[in-house]
Amino acid sequence: MTAIPFEKGLVETGDGIYAYLQPDGGWGWSNAGLISDGGQSLLVDTLFDASLTREMLGVMADATGVGADDIGVIVNTHANGDHTHGNGCCRKAEVVASEASAREMAELPASELAAIMAQARAMGPAGQYLVDIFGSFDFTDVAEKAPTRTFTGELNLKVGDKRVDLIEVGPAHTAGDILVHVPDDKTVFTGDILFIEGTPIMWAGPVANWIAACDRIIDLKAETIVPGHGPITDVHGVRRVQDYLRYIDQEARKRYDAGLSVRDAAHDIRLGDFSSWGDSERIAVNVSTLYREYAGDTSAPDVVQLFGLMAELKQ
């Protein structure tokens, strides 16, 4: 595959297949996709706020003639707001997600994120870190729309004559991650199973599921692989994500067995080549999730504390 420049905007990757890219691929700067055939259109994910989503939909309409009200289906690859907060901008669309993602969306509405951001400057280093990474987004201007159709396992859709396969691979990054595969066009939209040139963040785990999800992507033999964040990639990019996951699992396990705390382990792990990836401080969340996995602890993490640790590691 010829390398596609990582520039903001819409790129046609195949016949009626488009990726919308948002550099730099860091916190909140996610990718989306459009699949169009025979007068039907499916949108893969929306963006972190309504303004960004409307801008994207305008670019898509100008390039393809497919307007917001022409989109019949939105597929959310997972529950995070940077992939869902613009769902309501497509008023006529059915919204499809995994059952697990639908539950997660209901648990953290945008209003809660807006409330946290309103208090962020009073939250010390963790709050300042939140301002630094999320200050560009307007969580008071969102267009939420809950899934109207959910599934587990796999779901096969048709967009015109194109077959679109939804493949559940979570829990991994989140509880309900899915892949969107267009087999005839050898294209897969991976959601946040792939962060390319950025550090993966594991909110859910287990890590083995995420590694297996990467194997599933490889097995699809897609020629165009659109990640949730970062530039369009190929199998090499998928394997590098696997390398990272295996490495941090190995390194976190050593420190867990040695009795180090999450904080000490996150500071102690040397990232080597992976240190050049953006947002390397996400090691804090990854170690926390791995430690809870090792301990069989299913309780929710202290998210504010984790953002504080990421702020500390960022310095």
Regions found by a protein language model. Give the residues of each.
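Short, exposed beta-strand/loop patches in secreted or surface proteins that constitute
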Residues: 3-12
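Short Pro/Gly-enriched beta-strand edge/turn motifs at strand-loop
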Residues: 13-18, 134-140, 160-166
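Divalent metal-coordination and catalytic microenvironments
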Residues: 16, 35, 45, 60, ...
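Metallo-beta-lactamase
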Residues: 40-42, 46-51, 156, 163-254
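Active-site HxH/HxHxD metal-binding segment of metal-dependent hydrolases
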Residues: 52, 58-149, 156, 175
